[in-house]
Design a protein with these regions (language model features):
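Glycine-rich beta-strand-to-loop/alpha-helix junction loops that act as flexible
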Residues: 8-10, 65-73, 116, 189-190, ...
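Proline/glycine-rich low-complexity loops and linkers
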Residues: 48-51, 58, 72-137
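Glycine-rich phosphate/diphosphate-binding loop of Rossmann-like nucleotide-binding domains
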Residues: 1-39, 197-198
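Short alpha-helical segments enriched in small residues
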Residues: 195-201, 207-387
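N-terminal small/polar loop signature for handling phosphorylated ligands or for N-terminal nucleophile
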Residues: 23-84, 88-89, 295-310
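Conserved hydrophobic helix-helix packing surfaces used for dimerization/oligomerization
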Residues: 3-5, 112, 239
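Accessory alpha-helical/coil subdomains and C-terminal extensions
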Residues: 107, 114-187, 192-200
Length: 387
């Protein structure tokens, strides 16, 4: 079946609001096995919306319209639809997260679905009510499996699986950049559930073979920080963190995981050079010669926190998150991350792009990825050495 997505709102046209709804709906269509050839944004104008709907119904079986459903003067979607589909059967979608309900209009073979503009309202409404409704409209069973990777870029993943990513292929493979992580989603269509599941298995096996240690989970619900905590627990390790530019975000991600008290010892934020010297024992000469944003300082930070807390594993982060302070030699987005696993120290250099918040978030993901990599490599070497 063919789906078309229409997003309504002047704020989308002016760039005041980013259109995350269209991305979400398009992704859900992939899960359903539907094809989406057009996505359109239209302002709060009834005649333009009606014109767009009439065009969409000529080329799509299902039209997903989001936005313009509230009580404000510029919420014109429902009235526009009523005038075009005055004889359609109407099914109401209850909004459990807001005031404005959604609607499904059934007009012969066409389905027009109206959804609120707020993502907090749209996403649960679609997932809980619209997705099951649409699933019944197809005789195909759709099953998906998500493989989550870290410590690798989306381009590197795509380059490695070009031969597997044929759009006409079943199962269908798609990659998604998730702020430093890469998620690979495998979607299979079949007439029976067992057949769809069977089709996915060899693809997942091949992905595991190609990416090996970069894959941290094949379960949708498992986060990167959860996988790190599980790894620490499995190896009976305690961890401490020392952060500068990330300001405690790494510790916060770890502490979000239930049961982390079994492995997490201490988290420090040493933003100033003075704090780095006083708390960690970073040398004044090192700071003067290399500056706080350097591999040398990241190394002394991670060694200092190891001595201070006696943790088995320690991680340090220092960098330039911007927007100011960058130079040609040390630009904004330059980050050094150190990891010490039982005395084996590794320091990596990273270059991130984006605003201050995005750079810090990417740095945290990189720190978790490096933590995981270093622990795995340490124990693989220990195991090999014991053979």
């Amino acid at each position: 079946m063919v789906v078309e997505i229409i997003s309504v709102g002047n704020e989308l046209l002016t760039g005041t609001v980013v259109n995350t709804n269209a991305a979400f709906l398009a992704e859900q269509c992939v899960f359903l096995g539907f094809e989406c050839f057009y996505q359109t944004v239209v302002g709060d104008d009834k005649s333009r919306l009606q014109e767009l709907i009439k065009t969409a119904e000529k080329r799509a079986d299902i039209i997903l319209i989001n936005g313009g459903l509230g009580q404000a003067d510029d919420d014109i979607t429902k009235d526009s639809i009523k005038e075009v589909y005055d004889k359609a059967t109407v099914l109401e979608l209850e909004n459990q997260n807001g005031l404005t309900n959604g609607f499904i209009l059934e007009e012969q073979t066409k389905r027009i679905i109206l959804l609120p503009g707020s993502p907090k309202e749209l996403e649960p409404m679609f997932t809980e009510q619209v997705f099951p409704y649409l699933q019944e409209k197809t005789d195909m069973v759709i099953r998906t499996r998500t493989i989550k990777l870290c410590g690798i870029t989306e381009k590197e993943v795509n380059d490695a699986i070009t031969d597997l990513m044929n759009e006409e292929q079943n199962p269908f493979i798609a990659t998604y950049d998730k702020c430093g992580e890469v998620h690979v989603r495998v979607t299979a269509k079949a007439t029976k559930e067992k057949d769809a599941v069977k089709m996915i298995k060899p693809v997942v096996k091949e992905l595991k073979h190609r990416f090996n240690m970069n894959i941290y989970t094949t379960h949708e619900e498992t986060s990167l920080e959860q996988s790190c905590v599980d790894l620490l627990l499995a190896n009976n390790l305690r961890i401490s963190t020392m952060e500068s530019c990330t300001g405690g975000m790494l510790a916060a991600r770890l502490i979000n995981v239930p049961g982390v008290s079994e492995v997490f010892k201490v988290g420090y934020v040493t933003y100033s050079n003075k704090a780095k010297r006083k708390v960690l024992g970073v040398k004044q000469s090192t700071l003067k010669k290399h500056t706080a944003v350097s591999a040398e300082v990241a190394k002394e930070m991670v060694q200092g926190i190891s001595l201070l807390t006696k943790a088995d594993v320690t991680v340090s982060v220092t960098g330039l998150a911007g927007p100011d302070g960058g130079t040609k030699e040390k630009p904004v987005g330059l980050v050094y991350i150190g990891c010490n696993v039982k005395g084996k120290v590794v320091v990596e250099e990273y270059h991130f792009a984006g605003d201050r918040t995005h750079i810090r978030e990417e740095a945290v993901v990189a720190a978790l990825a490096l933590l995981r990599k270093c622990v795995l490599e340490y124990f693989s070497e220990v195991t090999f050495g014991n053979k």
